[in-house]
Amino acid sequence: MSKYALLQKMIINELLFLNDNVNYATNKLFSKDQANGELHKLLAMLLNYKKSNENAPNIKFDLKNLSFMLENKDKIDIIQFDDIKNYVQPAIVNLFESHNRSLNNYSTELSTLLEDGNENLVPNITDIDNIKLSHMQLARLLCYTAVVESRNSKPWKAIFNNDTNVLTDSFFNHIMNILNMIKTNQGSLAHNVSVVYHIENIQMNLENKLKPRSITIETVDKDKFENKHSDIEVCYVMNNSLHPQDVNSQQTLMCSSFVELNVLPFCLYNDTLPDDQSMSVFNLYKFEQTKNKSVSKPSRLGNVMFVNSLIDKPITRETIVNIINSYHNACQNLKRSGHRVVGDYRAYERDYKLAALDFIILMLVTSITHRTLKYNMLNIHEKMFQELKTVVCKHNAAKLYDILINYDINKEPLNNFRYNYEVL
């Protein structure tokens, strides 16, 4: 997907949202001005894109259509809340109480958190290459979309119908932490989360050798992986959806630790990750989960790399190339050399062959992009993965790439390296 195709996708997402409102009354806008604010932001994104891409096909038509809608906004019969804050605030209080949580000591802080108006509720994104969202706004929109069905927020709102969903406890703990931070005037709430789409394929340098010293396999208990604040942790997206769909998936665990991820589909006018694309999110709050559900301060900031999971894909040459490119584009775009990439076996807990393939791809990509790699592993397969690392690192990058594009997922992982393979 090209950058311009992504912009068009965002515009279509907004137009479908407005169509559902105007023609089917399946949602209500936060205010009469919400659509106006969002259309202005999308128009600004197109104009900024046009500055460096004068010859983009059809952009003049998209600009004309958005401008036409803005010029005629008063003729669009939008269904909206008259006073969204006075609806959301008691709804959030009731939501907490229905899950045995109390906000009685936070009425002032809650009012501050739930400030309305476009400056607070419309994500201030005007450049696809410079997406920044404050922690305060993300927390605010997590609350609004938890009780009001809005753009791309239906799956998020639906989790509160299920008391057993790990995301619900994470949300309540997250908001309690935010309210405590407001109470103590912590300045980091105004700091930004940064979102970077990795869209353009970057040419790979396959002249390099593999770097075993830069690759670590860490075996720990299932729920006790500890990563550094400078790490970028891979989140394996299932079914191309930025909304976690399986309560037991690694994606759900990641969205539980990094709660702010759950509101990105609303903020980005986009809830999917195409097969050939990846996305990185930097400086997220990470809250540690505790068994007694006690509220604690955010343990640190963290970073997440969204890459599509192999688990719901046919393991074809095209799929493998897409995953290689997704990882490669993301690793090449990491601005800080200190970012260590962290893969996670939990994404493929039920299929060690897919975990092995993911590990091999990450060994290739991190080596040729001069990144370090840690792969979180359960004890049961440590010996096989250590042997796999030893065998893989005997190959140069070009040879390993050839093996990968002809990889047979039905074989034992090591057997893809022990025997001659036939070119598909």
Curated annotation (Swiss-Prot):
GO terms for cellular component: host cell cytoplasm. Its main location: host cell. It comes from the Viruses. It is found in: Host cytoplasm. Keywords: Host cytoplasm. Plays a role in per os infectivity in vivo. Facilitates embedding of occlusion-derived viruses (ODVs) into occlusion bodies (OBs). This is Protein ORF114.
